[in-house]
Swiss-Prot record:
Residues 737-747, 845-864, 894-903, 934-944 have a biased composition (Acidic residues). Residues 19-215 form the Laminin G-like domain. One of its GO terms (cellular component) is extracellular region. Residues 19-232 are annotated as: Heparin-binding. It comes from Bos taurus. Residues 547-587, 646-690 form the EGF-like domain. This is Thrombospondin-2.
Length: 1170
């Protein structure tokens, strides 16, 4: 009665335990994640615990995370309890690897910790991060991924990381850091089964997944039913392994939506159960003692029976006791192979078996047989007999069998392969109940058929032993049948159906036709009979007389069809393909003349060759590829025409660029047709590329490039700081950008007043912090050192600043070279520098910084290309670059003859260079006048950044317009720009108001790229670049903030700047000033000022001392904009396609806002106008 109560109490423990739990000591992860049968991708199964479902997940992108409220309570419990326990019932797919639990965030790809069951390695891995460092701890030989249900307990408490499977400790390890003290909940998510990547999701079934916060692992395992070695009573119960098997399985009350409590099952108190266990322990000891005493008594009885000749019940019965067994009167048994014994009146009488004399010269002794035997001729080839099997009955009469084998391919093999004999292991006691037992199977019968597939049968009897005293009969069948395969049966052949009659051999005067059949339905097999009859049959056909044939004289042109009539007349059909005529007389057809576009045409002669008959095309011209059709007749010429396409090694993968380089197709007119540029993160000549850590276009190590191709193949002299110009004044191998003393004069650059000129004495007469040896005005204070005419004499002390031989006081354009001093509007400002040359405006004010004075600026621009209508050379067609190669006042975009050579653009082989003769020596459809230099600017197309605009040939920001976006007030100073690398690198050194350094080159479609680097850790604000600049009120800007921050001036509008890359379009109604300033700082839209087109949702800010590479693609015609930002070789931010047609092009520039020491290096712009 005690055992059922004990089992009932242990079964009821999980429910009682769940009810006793504090609401923050156990969390049902499925419940607080809202995972149920309605969850997409979650499939329900039956697990070890029938009261709750088990789940398998197949769509991990739909798995919901733990609710934010419960996640906060969980992390607080982890800190309070110094860790946690994870319990679950799991059935993991064999040799799979998957995540059990993970805490992801705050970033989209960052994980604070995760627990992974690694099947291939047979480990349970704990991965966590502390202070940006990853820690991985693996428990080995855990045996979880074997497709078997396991009840696991994972302990992560204090400095311990352990795994228990059931009640057994599998492995344990010490934690390096108590990571659970540093977990963050804001913007974090906790997932069950969801891995960081697709291949690390958990594959298998999970049930009862809980996070538990107990005081110790012993308490938790004890509540799960595991016995601890703490006393004799516990040992007494656990030793009896047959009494009770506990399957550790915890069912806990989840913390989440309320569920109905399971009813109480156990009505006994813990004291009553403890008393039962103590009573059972005592009973166990008593039973063991009784069992030992019974064994001793049995041994004594055995000894007494041997002394008195049998047990008391058999003393008056005639029987014998031999070798511990009873034998009935006259019962005979075999003691060994040559001795037989018989029971005679309580006595055992034994005698030797006598053997007859052998009848052969070479008798054969068989093991287990007393007498020798002779091998008969028919038994040649047989193997020796095998050992006899054990007796089929444990008492009474049974049978034994043995077998042998024979090679039937070379022997007759007469005689049986199996022998059976009777055996007896003692008389059965008929006074006891006995179940029946099967005898050995009989040999298989012969096959039921002589050919084909039949059956063989064997039987057995339920007599070893026979059931008695109500014993059970034998289970199973006494007959067994299986298929047998005889030799194949013969198949007689049969004919297939007759084939159709063949055509008659003649059309008249009698001919023969025939038909055939085949003996294959079926064909004869296995000795079957062949088909009877013939395989071919013939009969006469077309017996009528033949008419007179007028075509026998071949009156028609060869190839034309001739038709004959019964009266002897005839007619000719049409001429064959490639000929013209009436069928009797035909002449060659010139397909080339009729179908003029059958072959590819160039500026030279037609490439079609007429033949008799037919035509063919010449091969495609050099640097083209395509087909070379040929044929006969107009239909062929109109159907298949020659198509020759320009060769494109980049598309055909026939280029020789490096695997880390991009192949750029220049056109089939260029020689070479492509160029190679190393990808971001690499540098070199494109044929060879090496790693480039600072993204300035120079490799970390010297590269072995092609002969004389040293540019971008020499080792970077500042490998960790962008310096695309590689300036090295003192030639010491260390670039000026990272050299503390550029001129080697012993004075560090920070203190040197002539950083690039040896002057250890540091004389500075005018106290402008520029040493006398390098001061272009040593006696006049001019720290800016501006020298407009680049003659070595600064503007501050020059009498002719622009070098036009007109002194400053008489020069109406003192900063612009103008020897003619023309001043059309008479305002004292020369036409060369007058922003309104036809309107009197001596003050030259230009509020919107669009280079057009306010007096003549009407801002009417119908095509939105940045040029007002009365100054636009194509006012109705967007052409921001205003290209006009024939200088006729009409822009190329709306001029049908750009070079004014009398050849329309659509037929001109040099559209931008006048060549009325259209000379093309190599016949490649590119005129000789513009071969390899399409815009005739003396820069080869392969090196020209704008090969179709002679006004722009290379990237150059040496001349730029400084635009101050908040020119009033003293919040900060204006930007200070330092020019390097012939205008391909600019450095902004000041912590300034928002400002732009915008170049003067204008673009429609453009690609703009550069390297971004902040060489300080003192600030965290904005920097970036502008494109489509038309005025200080109208432009696009890409700006990047390091950290999220509210602008310190909250008037006129509140401005919140979020970290990350932003793409904005500025269309300000107020222009420069505090309104535009705050709108630029703000991440979002500000009405009448700025609209945000895209902000990187990852909110990744730039890092100090880290090189980034941006790439802008802008196609104003469609509005396509895309911004890519690389960190090293990897893409950090990608806007994807953004479409906006606010502006149809403009100028390019660089942007800063309150950020100092910003490097813009290796700048590159390329025109993409077609």
């Amino acid at each position: 009665m005690l055992w059922p109560l004990l089992l009932l109490a242990l079964w009821a423990w999980p429910s009682a335990q769940a009810g006793d739990q504090d609401e923050d000591t156990a969390f049902d992860l499925f419940s607080i994640s809202n995972i149920n049968r309605k969850t997409i991708g979650a499939k329900q199964f039956r697990g070890p615990d029938p009261s709750v479902p088990a789940y398998r997940f197949v769509r991990f992108d739909y798995i919901p995370p733990v609710s934010a409220e419960h996640l906060g309570r969980i992390t607080e419990a982890m800190r309070r309890k110094e860790g946690f326990f994870l319990t679950a019932s799991m059935k993991q797919d064999r040799r799979s690897r998957g995540t059990l639990l993970a805490l992801e965030g705050p970033g989209a790809t960052h994980r604070q910790f995760e627990i992974v069951s690694n099947g291939p390695a047979d480990t349970l891995d704990l991965t966590y991060w502390v202070d940006g460092t990853q820690h991985v701890i693996s428990l080995e030989d855990v045996g979880l991924a074997d497709s078997q249900w396991k009840n696991v307990t994972v302990q992560v408490t204090g400095e311990t990381y352990s795994l228990y499977v059931g009640c057994d400790l599998m492995d344990s390890f010490a934690l390096d850091e108590p990571f659970y003290e540093h977990l963050q909940t804001e913007r974090s998510r906790m997932y069950v089964t969801k891995g960081a990547a697709r291949e690390s999701h958990f594959r298998g079934l999970l049930q009862n997944v809980y996070l538990v916060f107990e005081n110790s692992v012993e308490d938790l395992l004890s509540k799960k039913g595991c016995q601890q070695s703490q006393g004799a009573e516990t040992n007494a119960i656990s030793e009896n392994t047959e009494t009770l098997h506990l399957s550790p399985m915890v069912t806990m009350e989840h913390v989440g939506p309320s569920a109905e409590k399971s009813p109480e099952v156990c009505e006994h108190s813990c004291e009553e159960l403890g008393s039962m266990i103590r009573e059972l322990s005592g009973l166990h000891v008593i039973v063991n003692q009784l069992h030992e005493n019974l064994r001793k008594v049995s041994n004594d009885n055995q000894f007494l029976w041997e002394l008195i000749g049998g047990p008391p019940k058999t003393r008056n019965v005639s029987a014998c006791w031999q070798d511990g067994r009873f034998f009935a009167e006259n019962e005979t048994w075999v003691v060994d192979s040559c001795t037989k014994c018989t029971c005679k009146k309580f006595k055992t009488v034994c005698h030797q078996i006598s053997c007859p004399p052998a009848t052969c010269a070479d008798p054969w002794f068989v093991e287990g047989e007393c007498c020798p035997s002779c091998v008969h001729d028919g038994e040649e080839g047989w193997s020796p007999w095998a050992e006899w099997t054990e007796c089929s009955a444990t008492c009474g009469s049974g049978t034994q069998q043995r077998g042998r084998s024979c090679d039937v391919t070379s022997n007759t093999c007469l005689g049986p392969s199996i022998q059976t004999r009777a055996c007896s292991l003692g008389r059965c006691d008929h006074r006891i109940r006995q179940d029946g037992g099967w005898s050995h199977w009989s040999p298989w019968s012969s096959c039921s058929v002589t050919c084909g597939v039949g059956n063989v049968t064997r039987i057995r009897l339920c007599n070893s032993p026979v059931p008695q005293m109500g014993g059970r009969s034998c289970k199973g069948s006494g007959r067994e049948t299986k298929a047998c395969q005889g030799p194949p049966c013969p198949v007689d052949g049969r004919w297939s159906p007759w084939s159709p009659w063949s055509a008659c051999t003649v059309t008249c005067a009698g001919g023969i036709r025939e038909r055939t059949r085949v003996c294959n339905s079926p064909e004869p097999q296995h000795g079957g009979k062949d088909c009877v009859g013939g395989a071919k049959e013939q009969q006469m056909c077309n017996r009528k007389s033949c008419p007179i044939d007028g075509c026998l004289s071949n009156p028609c042109f060869p190839g034309a069809e001739c038709s004959s009539f019964p009266d002897g007349s005839w007619s000719c059909g049409s001429c064959p393909g490639g000929f013209l005529g009436n069928g009797t007389h035909c002449e060659d057809l010139d397909e080339c003349a009729v179908v003029t576009d059958v072959c590819f045409a160039t500026s030279k002669a037609h490439r079609c060759v007429n033949t008799n008959p037919g035509y063919h095309c010449l091969p495609c011209p050099p640097r083209y590829k395509g087909n070379q059709p040929f044929g006969v007749g107009l239909e062929a010429a109109r159907t298949e025409k020659q198509v020759c396409e320009p060769e494109n090694p980049c598309k055909d993968k026939t280029h020789s660029c490096h695997r880390h380089a991009e192949c750029i197709y220049l056109g089939h007119f260029s020689d070479p047709m492509y160029k190679c540029e190393c990808q971001t993160g690499y540098a070199g000549d494109g044929l060879i590329c090496g790693e480039d850590s600072d993204l300035d276009g120079w490799p970390n190590k010297n590269l072995v490039c092609a002969t004389n191709a040293t540019y971008h193949c020499v080792k970077d002299n500042c490998p960790l700081l962008p310096n695309s110009g590689q300036e090295d004044f003192d030639k010491d191998g260390i670039g000026d950008a990272c050299d503390d003393d550029d001129d080697n004069d012993g004075v560090s650059d920070e203190k040197d007043n002539c950083q690039l000129l040896f002057n250890p004495r540091q004389f500075d007469y005018d106290k402008d912090e520029v040493g006398d040896r390098c001061d272009n005005c040593p006696y006049v204070h001019n720290p800016a050192q501006i020298d407009t005419d680049n003659n070595g004499e600064g503007d501050a002390c020059s009498v002719d600043i622009d070098g036009d031989d007109v002194f400053n006081e008489r020069d109406n354009c003192p900063y612009v070279y103008n020897t003619d001093q023309r001043d059309t509007d008479g305002d004292g400002v020369g036409d060369h520098c007058d922003n309104c040359p036809l309107v009197h405006n001596p003050d030259q004010t230009d509020v919107d910084n669009d280079l057009v004075g306010d007096q003549c600026d009407n801002n009417e621009d119908i095509d939105e290309d940045g040029h007002q209508n009365n100054q636009d050379n194509c006012p109705h067609i967007p052409n921001a670059n205003q290209a006009d190669h024939d200088r006729d006042g009409q822009g190329d975009a709306c001029d049908s003859d750009d070079d004014n050579d009398g050849i329309p653009d659509d037929r001109d082989n040099c559209r931008l260079v006048a060549n009325p003769d259209q000379e093309d020596s190599d016949g490649d459809r590119r005129g000789d006048a513009c071969k390899d230099d399409f815009d005739n600017d003396s820069i080869p197309d392969i090196d020209d950044v704008c090969p179709e605009n002679n006004a722009i040939s290379e990237t150059d920001f040496r001349n730029f317009q400084m635009v101050h976006l908040d020119p009033k007030g003293t919040t900060q100073i204006d930007p200070n720009w330092v020019i390097r690398h012939q205008g391909k690198e600019l450095v902004q050194t000041a912590n300034s108001d928002p400002g732009i350094a915008v170049g003067f080159d204008e673009f429609g479609s453009v690609d703009f790229s550069g390297t971004f680097y902040v060489n300080t850790d003192r600030d965290d604000d904005y920097a970036g670049f502008v494109f489509g600049y038309q005025s200080s009120s109208r432009f696009y800007v890409v700006m990047w903030k390091q950290v999220t921050q509210t602008y310190w001036e909250d008037q006129p509008t509140r401005a919140y700047g979020y970290s990350g890359v932003s793409l904005k379009v500025v269309n300000s109604t107020t222009g420069t000033g505090e309104h535009l300033r705050n709108a630029l700082w703000h991440t979002g839209n500000t009405e009448g000022q700025v609209r945000t087109l895209w902000h990187d949702p990852k909110n990744i800010g730039w890092k100090d001392y880290t090189a980034y590479r941006w790439h802008l693609t802008h196609r104003p015609k469609t509005g396509y904009i895309r911004v890519l930002v690389h960190e090293g070789k990897q893409v950090m931010a990608d806007s994807g396609p953004i479409y906006d047609q606010t502006y149809a092009g403009g100028r390019l520039g660089l942007f800063v806002f309150s950020q100092e020491m910003v490097y813009f290096s290796d700048l590159k712009y390329e025109c993409r106008d077609v």
